[in-house]
C-alpha cells in the first residue's frame, strides 16, 4: 500500500504542468509527502544530493528526466511547510481543548 501511494505521488508530480502544478503541489504534498516521510532515510538522503547521483537515481526509479528531480526539491520544501503548519495547528487545538476542560 505504501509503495503504491509513493509511486502515485511521483507520477502526478511528473505529469503536472502549468496551471495544474500549483493546485497539485498541495494535494501532492499530502499524498506523496506521507509516503516519503514514512520511507527510509536513505531515500531522502539520495534526493538531497545534487548532481549526477540524484539524476541517475531518479531515472532508475522511473522518473522522466532532470526536471522531475528539480520539482521534487521544490515539492519537499512545500511538504515541510505543510507539515509544520499542520503540527502548529494540531498543537494549538490540543492546548485549547486541554485548557477548556479545566
UniProtKB/Swiss-Prot annotation:
Signal peptide: none annotated. The keyword 4Fe-4S does not apply. Residues 56-71 have a biased composition (Polar residues). Residues 1-79 are extracellular. Residues 1-21, 33-71 are annotated as: Disordered. Residues 98-102 are cytoplasmic. It is a single-pass membrane protein. It is found in: Host membrane. Glycans are attached at residue 65. Keywords: Glycoprotein, Host membrane, Membrane, Transmembrane, Transmembrane helix. The keyword Kinase does not apply. The chain crosses the membrane at residues 80-97. GO terms for cellular component: host cell membrane; membrane. Belongs to the HHV-5 UL15A protein family. This is Uncharacterized protein UL15A. It comes from Human cytomegalovirus (strain Merlin). The gene is UL15A.
Amino acid at each position: 500500500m505504501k509503495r503504491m501511494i509513493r509511486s502515485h505521488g511521483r507520477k502526478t508530480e511528473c505529469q503536472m504542468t502549468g496551471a495544474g502544478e500549483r493546485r497539485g503541489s498541495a494535494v501532492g504534498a499530502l499524498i506523496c509527502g506521507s509516503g516519503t516521510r514514512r520511507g527510509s532515510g536513505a531515500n531522502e538522503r539520495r534526493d538531497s544530493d545534487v548532481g549526477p547521483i540524484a539524476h541517475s537515481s531518479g531515472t532508475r526509479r522511473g522518473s522522466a528526466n532532470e526536471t522531475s528531480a528539480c520539482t521534487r526539491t521544490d515539492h519537499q520544501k512545500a511538504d515541510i511547510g505543510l507539515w509544520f503548519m499542520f503540527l502548529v495547528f494540531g498543537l494549538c487545538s490540543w492546548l485549547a481543548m486541554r485548557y477548556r476542560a479545566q
